[in-house]
């Protein structure tokens, strides 16, 4: 398997409860390296651009409002099969359906406030990483 990078966001519900360290521990326990990380407060424009794929969905406005409601931690994760591995460690979007030991089972408050985002494909990972990180900010 090839080394791959994926993009992660620790969402406002995670930063508000000061559980970013616990989430990072689960990420690292899964064998992923955090090769870039910064805490930011997304602007409305950043959130709308990031979630543009959901623009026509009824929850879009609520999602954008949530993502700008407090700080987030944006990250680049690296490892073998990183995209699938991170999606496994995140768990199902609905925390009640997430497997034991996953981030969402342990920490998500609801389907909407589910603590983390992870890229779903190599193409989206590249786009999402480029939205928040310059190449020299990623240090493997």
UniProtKB/Swiss-Prot annotation:
A GO CC term assigned to this protein in UniProt: cytoplasm
Main location: cytoplasm
Top-rank taxon, per record: Bacteria
Annotated binding of ATP, by residue: 11, 59, 87, 93, 104, 114
PROSITE patterns: NDPK, NDPK_LIKE
One GO-annotated biological process of the protein: UTP biosynthetic process
Principal EC category: transferase
Gene3D superfamilies: Nucleoside diphosphate kinase-like domain (3.30.70.141)
Residues that span the membrane, as ranges: none
EC number: 2.7.4.6
CDD domains the record matches: NDPk_I
Keywords assigned: ATP-binding, Cytoplasm, Kinase, Magnesium, Metal-binding, Nucleotide metabolism, Nucleotide-binding, Phosphoprotein, Transferase
Active site: 117
Subcellular compartments: Cytoplasm
Matching InterPro entries: NDK-like_dom (IPR034907), NDK-like_dom_sf (IPR036850), Nucleoside_diP_kinase (IPR001564), Nucleoside_diP_kinase_AS (IPR023005)
GO molecular function, one term: metal ion binding
Cofactor(s) listed in the protein's UniProt record: Mg(2+)
Catalyzed chemical reaction(s): a 2'-deoxyribonucleoside 5'-diphosphate + ATP = a 2'-deoxyribonucleoside 5'-triphosphate + ADP; a ribonucleoside 5'-diphosphate + ATP = a ribonucleoside 5'-triphosphate + ADP
Recorded coiled-coil stretches: none
Subunit and partners: Homotetramer.
Family statement: Belongs to the NDK family.
Function: Major role in the synthesis of nucleoside triphosphates other than ATP. The ATP gamma phosphate is transferred to the NDP beta phosphate via a ping-pong mechanism, using a phosphorylated active-site intermediate.
Protein name: Nucleoside diphosphate kinase
Species: Rhodopseudomonas palustris (strain BisB5)
